[in-house]
């Protein structure tokens, strides 16, 4: 695969994943959230003691941007804010029942995508792909 093919595939993959996630949200009963809000839910679902600062760092957006998203998600019933008993200045974010449901559906989409990618690959092919993905991941991490 030459440079242009790799570049074209990467560009297409990044764009398609975002579009497909957005379309699948619009076609579900969760049409009231955006893909950016879904990614916020995803971060909260991954970290049991998520805070607004943690979400901001994970999504690489400002705290103001996260706060706006959190306000919307709380109003829509996807998350709740709970103050720490030890330090009342600390606010933890938790998914509500509705938030946990959409988070599970989103994880299911990603699981199906990964399974489809590796289906039929030999161990050596998986290893080579893993090396390429590790290089891509590290490149993106270094840009942060």
Residue ranges, per PLM feature:
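Short, locally clustered residues in the helix-turn-helix/winged-helix DNA-binding domain
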Residues: 42-46, 107, 134
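Terminal interaction helix/tail motif
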Residues: 6, 13, 108-144
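A specific heptad-register position in long alpha-helical coiled-coils used by two-component signaling proteins
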Residues: 11, 15-18, 71, 100, ...
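N-terminal helix-turn-helix DNA-binding core of bacterial DNA-binding proteins
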Residues: 22-62
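Charged, amphipathic alpha-helical coiled-coil/dimerization segments
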Residues: 72-128
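Regular, well-ordered alpha-helical segments
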Residues: 15, 19-22, 75, 119, ...
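N-terminal leader segment of winged-helix/HTH proteins
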Residues: 1-31
């Amino acid at each position: 695969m030459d440079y242009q093919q790799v570049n074209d595939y990467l560009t297409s993959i990044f764009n398609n994943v975002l579009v497909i996630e957005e379309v699948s949200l619009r076609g579900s009963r969760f049409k009231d959230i955006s893909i950016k809000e879904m990614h916020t839910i995803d971060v909260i679902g991954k970290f049991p003691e998520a805070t607004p600062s943690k979400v901001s760092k994970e999504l690489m957006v400002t705290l103001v941007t996260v706060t706006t998203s959190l306000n919307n998600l709380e109003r829509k019933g996807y998350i709740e804010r709970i103050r720490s008993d030890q330090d009342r200045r600390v606010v933890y974010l938790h998914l509500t029942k509705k938030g946990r449901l959409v988070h599970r559906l989103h994880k299911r989409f990603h699981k199906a995508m990964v399974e489809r990618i590796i289906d039929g690959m030999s161990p050596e092919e998986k290893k080579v792909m893993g090396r390429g993905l590790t290089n891509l991941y590290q490149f993106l991490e270094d840009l942060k």
